[in-house]
Amino acid sequence: MSIKSDKWIRRMAEQHGMIEPFEPDQVRESDGRRIVSYGTSSYGYDIRCADEFKIFTNINSTIVDPKNFDEKSFVDFKGDVCIIPPNSFALARTMEYFRIPRTVLTVCLGKSTYARCGIIVNVTPFEPEWEGYVTLEFSNTTPLPAKIYAGEGCAQVLFFESDEECETSYKDRGGKYQGQHGVTLPKT
């Protein structure tokens, strides 16, 4: 299994629709101002956060249960900047829609710009033949409110291709998050 380069990422996005919308270069400015970068990098793709958020609140519940998650634990927010309360988290989704090839697995890591501010981005791997918008989790580990910027970079996806095709893909298993379009809450 080897990591894939910018040339491979561009080819797969442009010829096979692996990432839509796709930015073939690294974007660092918008309207003359510096932003958190996004687009193709040497061995990865920096994804952007859309403007749809679900901000965690503890007002309506007393326990967090991944098997029986209460939707009322979140406040919906739409905007260019999301403020995450201290020691809390928010869910969002990518602007990009992904179609992962059968021989590919991705690993997604948060960008250091956010990590250096105490904001951790968590995303699980994109499995072979998974497709959809990616649900992102932003944890604010600080005792202060933290900003997340929609339309800017938030994490980097690394693509690994196996030299052998998997026997059963995410699509074959009927994965519960296949084809997700909005911010998707936990499912069992």
From Swiss-Prot:
Q: Which organism is it from?
A: Ralstonia pickettii (strain 12J)
- One MF annotation (Gene Ontology) recorded for this entry: dCTP deaminase activity
Name of the gene encoding the protein in the UniProt record: dcd
Its protein name is dCTP deaminase
Keyword Ligase attached? no
Report the record's Gene Ontology biological process terms: dUMP biosynthetic process; dUTP biosynthetic process; nucleobase-containing small molecule interconversion
Record's subunit section: Homotrimer.
Q: Does the keyword field hold Nucleotide-binding?
A: yes
Q: Which UniProt keywords apply?
A: Hydrolase, Nucleotide metabolism, Nucleotide-binding
